[in-house]
Amino acid sequence: MQSADDKSLLARFFHADRSLTAVASELDSFDGRAEPDRCTRLVSRLRQNQDKVLAITNLIMEELLGEDRDPRAFRAKFPEEVLQENLAGQLWFGAECLAAGSSIMNRESESKEMRPLAQAVTKSLGNVRVLLRDQCLKNNVPNSKTLHLDLNDSTTEQLYESLKIFDRLFAEFELSYVSAMVQVKSRHEYEMQQWIGVLFSETLQRALKIGLLDQEMVDAFDPGLMFSIPRLAIVAGLVVYAKGPLNMDMPGDQLSEMFRPFRTILIKIRDLLRNLNNQELYQLEKLLCTNEDINTKVPLGSSSIEAPSPEHSSHPTTSSTQNNNNSSNNNHSSSSTNTTSTTITTAGTTNTHRTVERLVDQRNNNHNSNSNSSSNPTVEGATLRSPSMLSLSTTSTPTASPTPSPTPSHSIASTSSAATSSTNPPADWSDGDDEDEDDDDIDVDEEDPESSDDGTDEEQLLKDIVAADCASGYLIPNTNLGNLLQPQEVPLTDNFVASEDDEYGTAEQQGHQGLEEEEPSTSAAMLAATRTLQRLRLPSSDNEPLAEPTTIKASEEHMQQPSGRHHRHHQSHHHHHHHRHSHQHQHRQPHPHRTTRSGRKRCSLEAADPETIQPEREQNLASGDTSAASSLSDDVSLAMRNTTARLKFKSTENLLHRLFVCIAGVADQLQTNFASDLRQILRSVFLMNMSAAQEDIDIPEKTKESELFEFRASENDVIQESAGSNQSIYSAEEVNPELDNVFSAGGGNQATGQRHSAGASMQRNNTIDLASQPGEGSPSGATTTTSRSHVTRSRSLGDQEAASSATSSTAQLRQLEQQQQQQQLQIQLQRQRNNSVGSNTPSSASSTSSSSEQNSPVSARSGSRRRLQSNNETQMPSSATSTSATLSPPAWIPDGKAPRCMACQTPFTAFRRRHHCRNCGGVFCGVCSNASAPLPKYGLTKAVRVCRDCYVREVRSGMGVQGVQSVQSVQASAS
């Protein structure tokens, strides 16, 4: 018969199975409908016993089957709340109900399918219970931690096979039953959740890189990151990693189930995010992390979206007036000045709308390009006056290579007279500020249309087209802001060379960026125009003369005659960029997208004769592809839709606030609707991105004193294994050194030096150097100062004052050497005392302790110091100085070396703690070390724990020292 207190697996199974059988028999003995309360209590007990039986059976299967157990990798798809300890009991109870003919509520079809499997599970489990009961009666070893079964017995082999069958059936039933009860992810959904985890991890790494979050927050598992990371992941998934798991262009059923309910609002958020410039996006991300107030005028700071530095800004009005000196018409000059000032003050909302209208007009005019070629320069010239249309291909992603992107070289609003020439790369993403400032130029041109003629517009049109092609290192014919922000983007052309000319920035353009941050940008509209211009550009358009790509045209240059404007352009180039330009035609490029390095340096704004350009333009426009009009219609529709969405907001602050509310709302809904999945993802993200755990530093038992104190090593270093004295919380004052002391001693003309190792006797090797130096030009009776050059970890809390100023003699030095030898003998006695701690003989320990304490180096050193003071007192001159010195405390005996009290020899237990004496370093119990006294010689002015013997001795020695000091003070005052 099995004992109730037997802890072996078979015995535990026997008692649990017997209790389960008793409860089941009681349930079958009465009608549950007549006594519902009793039935409820018994059912609860039944399920508890089922859990216990299955838990023990699972342990037996783990030991017997081992690796032959059926895999349960499908549990990774289960919700977190399903994986509980009593899951096995619930499955057994459900299998019995299904086998008895019951059905799961609202799951009749699934119940019918699972009923045969449930019957097989209950039958297999009953067979396993019978076989295990037999083994309990045959092969049980009381209190055995392992099973002791007879492997040659047929019943053991039968038990092994029955357990394998039950394990397979139970795993299959677990998957079917849980899938019928709760929603279980499919393979695709599980993979999408893993991709969401990757997105969260990439988002966190990006936030750490640009300074939105700190690594300390990740290491500390800051709860605020549970809200910040999902919010930032939505922004990054829609804009930065637009082709990732939050790609809204894919069908809705392919999205992760976490974001599938929010697909509509996520599309709207994406459209608004694409209209943000670099600073606005950074402010939004910062707002999502910190909930700070929106301030679009603050510089970006440390962000992957690099902002132009403040020193690049210049005054556009001053720059524009410098080139007005060469204008051939006063009216043209005033128009140029108005253009620049309007760039600063005109609102960007109306300009954005007019830009879209220009795109629509251009689409309509493309159909009539053959019949009316004279109207095309005006329309296209107005459309081309936006640098973002031609410069978006120069943008890079936050994770792109650090090679500086070429600066756009066709800003019509700024002038060629730049105050500074910057070599910093331009801002990433899209240049919304440049778009705004050039939209203002369009308005000015509309107000004064008579100031420019057709020839100037025709010439400027082709020059701007060539400038866009040559100044752009990336040629992206059909793109959007999403794939512009893809990480690790490589140039799409094989002629991309980051030359020094490509790095020159435009001060005028960057100055407008700082002044127009509040104006809404129209990135989508500008992108549409970029695609349109690249489709309309043909190979013959690259026949134009080439110039520096960083030269920026002023608005007044469009209003001048070709000859006058050409002269001013050359003069501005020579003045600000210090380059020489030839006014001859360059060779024609065989392919428009394969410009050489030298050609890219010379392309694209130098003027040519309008008579030569006009026939080529007519030929190019006549041979345009008819498909450009249809594709342009789609691009313009997209641009108008995105721009119209932004125009609904009064200011940038309103737009950012609306985005914050929407993004935070979606992210917070994930906390409620998908709490389990979000917890799993965040747990994985934290584990992947936390700092590497520091390797455990194994602290050796024998800590070298060189790691703790600065001392001069010698053969007299003692008790290295007992360096635990500096680990005490009671001796915090002891291990923190104070300032070193300087001993003064008089000397004659004879230069003598002697190292006095008095500190070695204190087991901390406080080495004191006493060097007698002669005083130059002083009489024989003059005093010289002997400095203490090396006192290791000296304590000077200043309770003992030692007057040690006297003339040294050869006899005194000999006396010190004798004292040193005597102290070394005392050290050996102290070492023997420490080695005899574990002695079981109280008499020997006490005798050793008493003898060592009487011959303590402390008292020896104190006596030597008193003898030195008494000897020096008779020869002390009137000019003697007094300093103080304290000793190092003795080393503590490690706890492991002291199993018993060193006084009463009582063994230490968990309740009888060890206590160290601060005076001798010994280990005592609380009774033998219940005394306390100050130890001024160690710098301990407050009362600390000491043993009884040290207390009696220190009190007596303290009284003696005080008497000697009082006598010395009286003598000093009398002298």
UniProtKB/Swiss-Prot annotation:
Renumbered residue ranges of the record's region Disordered: 299-458, 504-523, 556-633, 740-891
Polar residues: bias regions: 751-770
UniProt cross-references to InterPro entries, sorted A to Z: FYVE_LST2, LST-2, Znf_FYVE, Znf_FYVE-rel, Znf_FYVE_PHD, Znf_RING/FYVE/PHD
Pfam families reported for this sequence: FYVE
Keywords from the named record: Metal-binding, Phosphoprotein, Zinc, Zinc-finger
Binding site for Zn(2+) 2: 917, 920, 947, 950
Zinc finger (FYVE-type): 895-955
One GO CC term, this protein: early endosome membrane
Record's compositionally biased regions (Acidic residues): 430-458
Compositional bias of kind Basic residues: 564-602
Residues with PTM Phosphoserine: 540-541, 796
Bias (Low complexity): 302-352, 365-376, 383-400, 408-429, 621-633, 802-860, 877-890
Keyword Zinc: yes
Molecular function (Gene Ontology), one example: zinc ion binding
Amino acids binding Zn(2+) 1: 901, 904, 925, 928
Family of this protein: Belongs to the lst-2 family.
Function as written in the Swiss-Prot or TrEMBL entry: Negative regulator of epidermal growth factor receptor (EGFR) signaling.
Designated name of the protein: Lateral signaling target protein 2 homolog
